[in-house]
Amino acid sequence: MQDNVIIDTSIFTNPNIYKSISLEQPIDAIEAFIGLTHKSSKKIYMPRTVYIELCKVVDLESIKSRFESSIIIKSPNRCNITINALALFDFVEDMRIRINKGLRIAEEFARDKTQDIQNTISKLREKYKEALRQGTLDSKEDVDVILLALELNGVILSGDEGINSWADKFGIRTVNPLFIQEFLSF
């Protein structure tokens, strides 16, 4: 049976991951990944929203035709995919907890009488982002990766904690992206 593999931008933009493919820049890792796909029996998919996001982060102009010939750019059929109500319930509860945590962080920083406003704002942004976004689905691109994996009964190859956490909740197989080369060679 041939694996359908769904990828996201993290494998090309997270230095810890893309350096396992190529020691250079993200564009070099993408070119190396394209080479790996040609030797693999697996079908590689990327949701269109993720592709658009990748194009904003990395200039693909010089390799766009090879990328689109090697990786299937496909949106999930959002109209026909059914999501378990318990998953929605869990997501809303998780968001409520995160929002409350974010409010507590904001209150803590509002009470801080430090004179260095710029430093305080930077710390607030970092803690707030960590509280609200880390380990959960925090974008439509993340949701599309999950939905496409459900639709195609696929395997997710991502370094995003939120995607991997929610893939686990839905029973979707994930592969550690540090093992990209080995995974694609089987």
Curated annotation (Swiss-Prot):
* EC number, as in UniProt: 3.1.26.5
Q: Which Pfam family, giving just one, matches this sequence? A: PIN_5
| Single biological process term from Gene Ontology | tRNA 5'-leader removal
- InterPro entries per the UniProt record, alphabetical: PIN-like_dom_sf, RNA_free_RNase_P
The UniProt keyword set, sorted, is:
Endonuclease, Hydrolase, Nuclease, tRNA processing
Q: Which CDD domains match?
A: PIN_VapC-like
**Is Nuclease included in the keywords of this UniProt record?**
yes
Superkingdom is Bacteria
Q: What is catalysed by this protein?
A: Endonucleolytic cleavage of RNA, removing 5'-extranucleotides from tRNA precursor
**Has the keyword Membrane been applied to this entry?**
no
Q: Name one GO molecular function term.
A: ribonuclease P activity
User: What does this gene product do?
Assistant: RNA-free RNase P that catalyzes the removal of the 5'-leader sequence from pre-tRNA to produce the mature 5'-terminus.
Annotated PANTHER family: RNA-FREE RIBONUCLEASE P, UPF0278 PROTEIN TK1425
What the record says about family reads: Belongs to the HARP family.
Recorded protein name is RNA-free ribonuclease P
- Please report the organism this UniProt entry assigns to the protein: Hydrogenobaculum sp. (strain Y04AAS1)
